[in-house]
């Protein structure tokens, strides 16, 4: 199954599958807590999560998504990764993949920071003592009394997990679309082929639109945007040095 997949793409897929099986078979919340990505000001944040969150995916018994989270990400990587890896070479491909994942984390949490400031302002407008609330939320979350929607939003940001390879995978898709803009892509849910150069702006615009509407269904849409932008920028820079594309 993996013999015809270039080594970096193959190893990334294998690592994701192994991590997924280990975290689900042992069903340990500890691994999800320390390896998933948290908001940088959350008490659950650790610096390594900027990388490790890329290898974590929704539990297989999680309502609404389950194993489709990792299946969709790995199928997408399997579809676009090999051509990009062969074109860029292993070193550049690794750089693009991980910088896209890091970019997705940074943009998502930058937007979270903006949301936090909005929630602070909203609570202050109704005379909530924000300092005391945040002190309770950070130091004693299980005993924090939450009544306001803005308080719920802050709890979601500070204790919500960011996980999945989606940001890095979106970077791979964006890189592919940048280097192969006229490649015709076929999807089950689209009755006609679509060129890669058309797909890229569609997914970015759609992700921005959905992100502004909130993380619908628990999906970190701005993470997708961050990954896609990094993939596009890197591929655009490197494209100038690639004299022959197959």
Could you tell me what each predicted segment is?
Residues 1-246:
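A detector for small-residue-rich transmembrane helices and their helix-helix packing motifs
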């Amino acid at each position: 199954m993996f013999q015809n997949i270039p080594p970096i793409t193959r190893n990334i897929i294998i690592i994701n599958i192994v991590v997924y099986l280990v975290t689900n078979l042992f069903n340990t919340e500890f691994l999800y807590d320390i390896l998933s990505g948290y908001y940088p000001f959350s008490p659950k944040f650790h610096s390594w999560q900027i990388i490790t969150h890329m290898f974590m995916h929704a539990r297989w018994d999680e309502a609404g998504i389950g194993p489709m989270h990792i299946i969709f990400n790995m199928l997408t990587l399997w579809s676009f990764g090999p051509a990009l890896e062969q074109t860029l070479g292993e070193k550049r491909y690794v750089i693009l993949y991980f910088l896209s994942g890091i970019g997705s984390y940074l943009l998502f949490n930058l937007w979270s920071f903006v949301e936090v400031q909005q929630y602070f302002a909203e609570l202050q407008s109704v005379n909530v003592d924000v300092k005391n609330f945040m002190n309770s939320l950070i130091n004693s979350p299980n005993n924090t009394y939450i009544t306001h929607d803005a308080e719920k939003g802050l709890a979601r940001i500070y204790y919500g997990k960011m996980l999945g390879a989606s940001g890095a995978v979106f970077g791979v898709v964006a890189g592919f679309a940048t280097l192969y803009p006229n490649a015709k892509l076929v999807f089950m849910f689209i009755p006609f082929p679509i060129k890669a150069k058309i797909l890229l702006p569609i997914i970015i615009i759609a992700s921005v639109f959905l992100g502004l509407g909130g993380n619908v269904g628990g999906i970190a849409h701005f993470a997708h945007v961050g990954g896609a932008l990094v993939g596009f920028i890197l591929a655009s820079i490197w494209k100038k040095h690639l004299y022959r594309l197959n």
